[in-house]
From Swiss-Prot:
Ranges of compositional bias, category Low complexity: 57-74, 248-258
Name of the featured protein: Serine/threonine-protein kinase HAL5
Entry-linked SMART domains: S_TKc
Catalytic residues, chain numbering: 688
Biased composition (Basic and acidic residues): 125-139
C-alpha cells in the first residue's frame, strides 16, 4: 500500500508538470469547462484528473478518425513476431501501478514532441473513448493469464470492428474519473511487463522499430509540410510576415483539429489564391556594374565587358532636314539653285572632311580636284537627279535566284548531279560548290547588267542628252521582261525612282575616284520592320547613295566590269543564301539551319543599283559613325563637353592618329576576322582591307565595304581554289608576295596579312611601314633583319595590354600573322581559333558556321 501511494504521488507530480505545460501551450476554451463536471473537489483529485487527461491527449488520439495517421504520434507497440498483442503501451506507461518501462525515455520524447499539436476539444472526445476502453480492459483482464490473444481496438494493430462501430452515446454511461489503480489494470500491466521482458532481442527489435517509425513519421510530416507550403505560397520565405506571428499559426492549427481536417495542421504562412501576384515574385536586384575605364566613346566595366558609343556624324545630328518631318524641307535640298539652300549647302561642304569614304572609291592623285568639279557640277545643276534614277535590277531576278539556289542544293541532295542548268540556250557547268557566293544566277545577272550598262553608255555617247528617254526605255524593257510570267507579280516599289524608294538627298559625305557619296533619308513606314536594313535615328531611315561615273578616257569595258563585280559580290554577300541542306562529297554543310543563317553582320549591305543618263547609283547601307580612318584621326581640334566644362582634344599630326585602347582594338579585330572569314567561306577574298574600307555603326558594329577589287577565288563550278598574281590594294597593307613579279599567291593569306596591318594601325596609331619592299622601306627592312637574327620585332615587344597573359598571346598571334613566307602564315580561321581571340570579348555573338571551301 505504501508503494502504491509513493507511485501515485510520483504520478501526481508528473501530471502537474505536464498539465502546467499544456496550460501554457493551449488557450482556455469554452468547451473545456464541461469536462470538469465529475471532477472531485479535492486538489489531489483535480491533479490526478489532469494527469489522466494529459495521458489521453498524448496517446489515445490514434483512435480518432479525424487525425491523419501520417501526423499521429508514434505508438510503442510490441514486436510484430510476438504472439501476444499489447493493448496500449503508451497509455499504460503512465499508470502509477507499474514500474517505468525500458522505453520510458522514448515515450516521453514522443509525448513532448507532439503534445503541442493537440487540441482541448479533441481531448474531451478522446477522454470518453479512453474510459470505454478502460471498461473493456476490465472485462478482458480475466483472459490475460490464460494467454488468449488480445486484439486491440485501434487500427494500427488490427482493431475490432465492433468496438469502432459502437455509438458515441454509450460513452455517457461510463464514469469520467475512472482511476488508474484498478486491480484489473494492475494485473494486466503486470502481465504486460512480464511479456515485454520475454526476450531481450524482442525488446531491441522493438526499440529499433520504434525509432525507425518515429524517424519515418517525422520525415513524412516534414515532406507534407513542404508540399503544402508550395501549394499555398510560391515560397515560404517570400511570403509577407503575419501580423500575429506564431499566434496566428497556432490558432489555425487549433481550428483545423477541431474541424476534423487534420491534414492542415502543419500549414505555414497565410492561405493564398491560385493566381500568383507579381509583388510576391522575387525582385531582381539590378547591381550596377562599376565602370573602370571611360574614354567617352569606349567604356570598360569591372566584369570585363565593354560598351561602344561612337559619335554619329554631324551631318546627321546637325542637319535641319533630318530633324524636320516635312518632306518639303528635304525636297528643297535637291534643288541647289534655290535661294534658301545656301546655308545648307555651305554646312554640307564643311562636313565633307569628317567622313572619309576613300575606301568606297580607289584613291587617286586628282581626288581634291574632282571633288571641286563635283561641287561645281552641283552648283550648275549638273548632278544626278535622284528623282529620275530608276533601278536596273529586274524585280523577278532575285526571286528566281532564290528558287534556283534552293533547287541547286536539292538536286545535289537527291543525286541529280548530271542535270545541267541552262541559260538562254547555253549550258552551265555542274554545280560543285553551292556555298559559293557567285553561282549560276549571279552569272546571269552579271551578263544582264553588263549588257544594260554598255548599252546605256554607248547610247549616251551617240544620242547626247537623250538619257532620260533611254532610262525610261530600260524601265519599259524590265517591265516587259517580268510581265506575263507564271506565278510572278510586279512589285510596287520595283520601278519607283530613287527619291521615292530611298528618300530625299540631304548631303554629301565623301568623294572618290568615280564620284561622290551622298546621304538620302526618308520617314519610316509600316512596312519597315526590325531589323532595319540600314541606320535609323528612330524617325527616319538613312541610305548611302554612291554615284558612279566613268572618268574621261576610261574604257567602257573596264568601268562595266568594275561596276558589275562590285555590285554582284556585295549584293550576294550581304543577302541571305538558301543553300542550306547541300551534301557535297567530302564537305558536309549544316543540317537544316534557318534560311538566313548565312547573313553576316559584318558585311555592308548592297541594296540596289540604279541608272540615270550615263551615271549609275549604288544604294548601300549607311553607317552613321564613319570609317576606321576617321576614328583614328578623329578631329584635329574639337571641343567636347564634360560635366559642363570643355576639354581640348590633342591635335593629331598628319599621317598619324590616336591609337585605340587594346580591348577596343581586340573587339574590332575579332569582328573584322569574322567578316573576312565569312567572305572566304563563300569563295571571295577582299584584297583591299584597310581602315578606309571598314565602317562602323554607333554601337561599334563593324562593316566591311568596297568589293570593287575583290577576288572570286572559287565559284560554284570550281572544286579547288585558284590563285592570282599582281599587286592589288593599298601599298601599306599589301602582302610582300604580291610584289613578286609573275608569282601566284593565295588571296586568302593576303587578307590575313592585311588584317594584321590594320590591327597594328589601331593600337599604334600609324602604319607599320609604307610598303613591304625592303629596298624601298627601311622599317620593313629592319623588320626582316630582326626577325631573322633575334626572332622578334621591337615594335611588337613594346606593345602593352591590360594583362601580361593577353599581351603574350597577342604577340604569338602577330608573329604568326606576319610570316613573310605565305606557306608558314596563319589563316583567318586559325587566327580566330587562337588563344588570343578566344579570350577576346566581342560585342557581336556569332553563330558557329561549319561551311568549308575545298582546297
Amino acid at each position: 500500500m505504501g508503494d502504491e501511494k509513493l507511485s501515485r504521488h510520483t504520478s501526481l507530480k508528473r501530471a502537474r508538470s505536464l498539465s502546467e505545460s499544456i496550460k501554457g501551450l493551449f488557450k482556455p476554451s469554452g468547451i473545456s469547462g464541461s469536462n470538469n463536471a465529475a471532477a472531485p473537489s479535492s486538489r489531489p483529485g483535480q491533479d490526478q484528473a489532469h494527469s489522466h487527461q494529459t495521458a489521453r491527449i498524448i496517446t489515445s488520439n490514434v483512435s480518432s478518425p479525424s487525425i491523419s495517421p501520417v501526423h499521429s504520434p508514434v505508438l510503442q507497440a510490441a514486436p510484430k513476431h510476438h504472439k501476444l498483442g499489447v493493448p496500449n503501451i503508451a497509455k499504460l506507461s503512465l499508470s502509477p501501478s507499474r514500474e517505468p518501462s525500458l522505453n520510458s525515455e522514448n515515450e516521453m520524447f514522443s509525448q513532448e514532441s507532439f503534445i503541442s499539436e493537440k487540441d482541448e476539444d479533441e481531448a474531451n472526445l478522446l477522454e470518453r473513448e479512453d474510459l470505454q476502453n478502460k471498461k473493456e480492459e476490465k472485462a478482458r483482464a480475466k483472459h490475460v493469464r490464460s494467454k488468449e490473444a488480445y486484439v486491440p481496438h485501434h487500427r494500427y494493430t488490427g482493431g475490432s470492428d465492433e468496438v469502432e462501430r459502437q455509438p458515441r452515446e454509450r460513452l455517457k454511461n461510463f464514469p469520467q474519473n475512472a482511476g488508474s489503480s484498478n486491480p484489473a489494470n494492475s494485473n494486466a500491466n503486470h502481465v504486460l511487463d512480464q511479456e515485454n521482458n520475454f526476450s531481450i532481442d524482442a525488446m531491441l527489435d522493438y526499440d529499433e522499430e520504434s525509432k525507425l517509425r518515429r524517424r519515418n513519421s517525422l520525415g513524412v510530416r516534414n515532406h507534407s509540410n513542404r508540399t503544402r507550403s508550395r501549394k499555398n505560397s510560391l515560397s515560404t520565405p517570400r511570403s509577407p510576415p503575419m501580423k500575429n506571428g506564431n499566434d496566428g499559426m497556432n490558432s489555425n492549427a487549433t481550428n483545423n483539429v477541431g474541424n476534423g481536417t487534420g491534414n492542415r495542421i502543419y500549414m505555414r504562412g497565410r492561405n493564398q489564391s491560385d493566381s500568383i501576384s507579381a509583388s510576391s515574385l522575387p525582385k531582381f536586384q539590378e547591381i550596377e556594374c562599376k565602370c573602370i575605364l571611360d574614354l567617352g566613346h569606349f567604356k570598360v566595366f569591372e566584369n570585363g565587358y565593354h560598351e561602344h558609343s561612337l559619335r554619329v556624324l554631324p551631318i546627321i545630328t546637325n542637319n535641319k532636314n533630318v530633324d524636320s518631318g516635312d518632306e518639303k524641307d528635304a525636297d528643297a535640298s535637291v534643288n541647289s539653285g534655290d535661294d534658301g539652300d545656301n546655308d545648307s549647302e555651305a554646312n554640307m561642304h564643311k562636313q565633307k572632311s569628317v567622313f572619309s569614304l576613300s575606301g568606297l572609291f580607289k584613291s587617286h592623285k586628282d581626288g581634291n580636284q574632282q571633288q571641286q568639279q563635283q561641287q561645281q557640277q552641283e552648283e550648275n545643276g549638273e548632278q544626278i537627279n535622284l528623282e529620275k534614277a530608276f533601278s536596273i535590277i529586274p524585280s523577278q531576278r532575285f526571286i528566281k535566284s532564290q528558287t534556283v539556289k534552293k533547287s541547286r542544293t536539292s538536286n545535289l541532295k537527291n543525286g541529280n548531279n548530271d542535270e545541267l542548268m541552262k541559260n538562254d540556250g547555253k549550258n552551265i557547268p555542274q554545280i560543285v560548290n553551292p556555298n559559293a557566293a557567285v553561282g549560276a544566277e549571279e552569272l546571269k545577272l552579271i551578263n544582264a547588267l553588263s549588257e544594260k550598262i554598255r548599252k546605256g553608255l554607248k547610247s549616251e555617247n551617240t544620242k547626247g542628252n537623250n538619257g532620260e528617254g533611254r532610262s525610261n526605255s530600260n524601265k519599259q524593257e524590265d517591265s516587259d521582261d517580268t510581265e506575263g510570267k507564271a506565278g510572278t507579280t510586279n512589285d510596287d516599289t520595283s520601278h519607283k525612282p530613287c527619291s521615292q524608294k530611298y528618300g530625299k538627298y540631304i548631303g554629301v559625305v565623301g568623294a572618290g575616284a568615280y564620284g561622290v557619296v551622298k546621304i538620302c533619308a526618308r520617314c519610316k513606314t509600316a512596312k519597315d520592320v526590325l531589323p532595319y536594313s540600314t541606320y535609323s535615328n528612330g524617325k527616319k531611315l538613312f541610305f548611302a547613295v554612291k554615284e558612279l561615273k566613268p572618268k574621261p578616257g576610261d574604257q567602257i569595258d573596264k568601268f562595266c566590269t568594275r561596276l558589275t563585280s562590285e555590285f554582284i559580290i556585295g549584293h550576294s554577300l550581304s543577302h541571305p543564301h538558301f543553300e542550306a541542306n547541300a551534301m557535297i562529297a567530302g564537305n558536309v554543310s549544316r543540317t537544316t539551319p534557318p534560311k538566313h543563317v548565312f547573313n553576316a553582320p559584318n558585311i555592308l549591305k548592297i541594296l540596289d543599283l540604279m541608272e540615270y543618263s550615263n551615271s549609275f547609283v549604288e544604294v548601300m547601307e549607311f553607317c552613321a559613325s564613319g570609317d576606321l580612318y576617321s576614328l583614328l584621326t578623329r578631329n584635329n581640334i574639337s571641343n567636347e563637353s564634360n560635366n559642363g566644362s570643355s576639354r581640348l582634344i590633342q591635335t593629331v599630326k598628319e599621317g598619324s592618329g590616336s591609337p585605340l585602347h587594346p580591348l577596343e582594338a581586340d573587339c574590332f579585330m575579332k569582328q573584322l576576322l569574322n567578316g573576312v572569314q565569312y567572305m572566304h567561306d563563300h569563295g571571295i577574298a577582299h584584297c583591299d582591307l584597310k581602315p578606309e574600307n571598314i565602317l562602323f555603326q554607333p554601337n561599334g558594329l563593324l562593316k566591311i565595304c568596297d568589293f570593287g577589287t575583290s577576288s572570286v577565288f572559287q565559284t560554284a563550278w570550281e572544286k579547288h581554289v585558284h590563285f592570282q598574281s599582281g599587286a592589288m590594294g593599298s601599298e601599306p597593307y599589301v602582302a610582300p608576295e604580291e610584289f613578286i613579279r609573275d608569282a601566284e599567291y593565295d588571296p586568302r593569306l593576303v587578307d590575313c596579312w592585311s588584317c594584321g596591318i590594320v590591327y597594328c594601325t589601331m593600337v599604334m596609331g600609324q602604319y607599320l611601314w609604307k610598303i613591304a619592299i625592303p629596298e624601298k622601306d627601311s622599317l620593313f627592312k629592319s623588320f626582316l633583319s630582326e626577325i631573322k637574327d633575334d626572332g622578334q620585332f621591337y615594335l611588337f615587344e613594346e606593345l602593352r595590354h591590360v594583362s601580361s597573359e593577353l599581351n603574350r598571346l597577342r604577340k604569338i598571334a602577330l608573329y604568326r600573322t606576319f610570316q613573310v613566307d605565305p606557306t608558314k602564315r596563319i589563316t583567318i580561321e586559325q587566327l580566330l581559333q587562337s588563344s588570343w581571340m578566344r579570350k577576346t570579348k566581342c560585342c557581336v555573338v556569332y553563330r558557329p558556321l561549319h561551311t568549308k571551301v575545298s582546297k
